Amino acid sequence: LTLLPSIINGFDRKLNFVSFTPGTSFDLKSSTGIQQERALLFHLLKKGWDLPHIPTCNVLQCDVADKDRWRATIKNYEPGLKLDKNIVDAYFVELSQYIAWEKQKGLPDIRSRFFDLCTRFSYYQQHKNIPWEKIRDRNKIIGELRAILARTCLKALEPDLVILDEFQRFKHLLNNDSDAGLLARELFSYSDE
């Protein structure tokens, strides 16, 4: 779901076929996602928030053991150059609203927390040597950024028909109030109204 800005450029076709899996497409906060998702976030955030290059690489590297391979992934991430402008713009609107909500609640906002992570990850460390507190904070923020991106993509998708192949694999999403369940129900019950 979070890769839609790089996969579909403009939803101007009569039919868009997008495949989702219950474990990876909807469960966003429990993990940092796959490399391509983080490379997409890198390109989105670096441009939109004017982030420092190397620290942002370090924050989003997560469990990729080889630093050079991760940096090559970012450098060679072709979709990062031609993202759907409407989704990108909508993502930063959603982020701004989320930041305003956090500030209203008296919480440190996600942008400030990400910049703080960039400071804390300003130099490269092997994953095994990163203190657990840094990993926990990083994973939480990446999960939040992915969740906001997923909601943004869901709104852009505007599905008229959702077909569940192997629907029994989605059953757990229909009857729970987790973030993944709420996101799935939002997709399944989308209305043009």
Q: Where are each of the predicted segments found?
A:
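Coupling/switch/interface segments within P-loop NTPase motor domains and analogous charged loops
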Residues: 2-151
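Signature of the SF2 helicase/ATPase Hel1-core->accessory helical subdomain module
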Residues: 1, 124-193
